[in-house]
């Protein structure tokens, strides 16, 4: 540690949205608590995913929609690290950058928020009428929910959380409800709006969902040293296993791939990691499932193994329609 050149100032990059700022401020506060002599500043910017709101995420492309601009700032030295929702970070990072920390994973579930004016706050997905319109910008959610609730229709809904709530409440948009990640609603203190928590048996979650990913320059030992205490081992094992799987599937962040990853016998010598995964086509009519369990320390290889099983079962054929676009 004595060989690391210390700095008295650290600059964190963040997207400008309220949720992104809450997440980044949490990281800033942890760093300052652990390193009281360091000044920590936040520099914000909009990413492509923030600016282009009239096109679905899957059609824009998948090369770091919510990360690229911040990555460029790291590479040119404008910022020292960047805070992202881990599910938005591509599995293949630009040369010169690395994932410095994965924070403790919080709620991984998705939630249904009903249009209370139309259906009442406590309406469930299964209770909605034929043809009800649900807002979601995630192909993963849409595919799994079409599989479970074929009577529903889905329409893209983009923007930050506050914008999406306004779109839901605007009758001219025709939404009967929308699907959002519980973790974001918790951070924004908006859980009172939740009508239903969608169980894993209906919809598996996104790779990395519920954790923050902190990206930094590869070889910046000082930044890595201040990030090390923020790494949550159990969450890191689960999320890195999922990212290893996604990397080999070559699916990207915006295709219908869902996971549920669990640790058993935590912190015991026989600790194991279990991954359940699903790959679907857009309407959920075709899907492939797989499950694997093994020693948790082999998280990276377990991710590769379940990816290979999915590939052997035909996942590439299902995903080819998305990867081409």
Swiss-Prot record:
PROSITE patterns named among the record's database cross-references: PORPHOBILINOGEN_DEAM
Membrane-crossing residue ranges in chain numbering: none
Catalyzed chemical reaction(s): 4 porphobilinogen + H2O = hydroxymethylbilane + 4 NH4(+)
Gene Ontology molecular function: hydroxymethylbilane synthase activity
Cellular component GO terms held in the UniProt record: cytoplasm
Chain's role: Tetrapolymerization of the monopyrrole PBG into the hydroxymethylbilane pre-uroporphyrinogen in several discrete steps.
Name of the protein: Porphobilinogen deaminase
